[in-house]
Structures are given as C-alpha cells and as structure tokens.
A protein has these predicted regions:
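C-terminal and inter-domain tail/linker signature
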Residues: 1-127
C-alpha cells in the first residue's frame, strides 16, 4: 500500500527519515488549527512535535483505495486517551500531497492543543 511507508515512519516516530514521502507543496490540516500548514518544512516541524506529544501511539486500522488512505490510531496525551485518523491523499507521483488529522474526544483535542502550543513555543524543545 502507498501508505505503508508513512505508517512505518509514524510508528517509529521518525518523520525526518520520511521527508521524501511528502510533496514539496504538501498541505497539512490540523485538528486544532483552522488554517492549513503549507509545505514540506512546515509539515516536518509539526510532525516532529507530534511524535513528542503523543504517547503509546499505535495504528489500529488502515484502509486504502486509489489515491486516498485512512489510518485509524489510538494514543494518549498526558492522561487523555485519544482516537483519531490520518487521511492521506497522494499525488500522481505517489508523494503525499495532503495530510488531514482528525481526533476525538474534545477533551483530547484540548490536551493536544495545549501540549503542542507549549512545545512549539519552546525554542529548544524540538529535536
């Protein structure tokens, strides 16, 4: 499946090694921010933060058809259990052109937003 390499990178918490999976003009839609992030550098920054915030992350389902894949996951942020999906859209060359993340419940979204804000505001937090 086209999404296997993305899944492996996410499960290994190693999106830096997977940079070439993303199209240069990839669009990332966050569950906590209305405006999408544009470009590979922005996506890499966000995903580098996410792997530090998510605890006990694991995919539980993967469905792919044509140029779209949906990967369902479970994770934790602090004491909040979260369920979510990564929706991947692929360009003709196989690169990921869009990544949309949706999570539930609302308390999990709040915990995620707070943890991400703290991490992204810290100049030394991202490794």
């Amino acid at each position: 499946m086209k999404s296997d390499a993305f899944r492996a990178a996410a499960e290994a918490k190693d999106f830096r090694a997977a940079e070439d999976l993303f199209a240069p003009d990839v669009t990332f839609r966050s569950p906590v921010v209305f405006k999408p992030y544009e470009g590979r550098d922005q996506v890499q920054l966000i995903l580098s933060a996410v792997v530090q915030v998510f605890e006990d992350f694991r995919y539980i389902e993967q469905v792919e058809t044509g140029d779209v894949a949906v990967l369902q996951f479970e994770t934790r942020v602090g004491d909040r259990q979260i369920q979510g999906v990564d929706i991947l859209k692929f360009a003709e060359d196989g690169a990921i052109s869009e990544l949309t993340v949706m999570v539930r419940p609302l308390s999990g979204i709040h915990a995620l937003a707070e943890a991400m804000q703290k991490l992204l505001e810290s100049p030394t937090a991202l490794r």
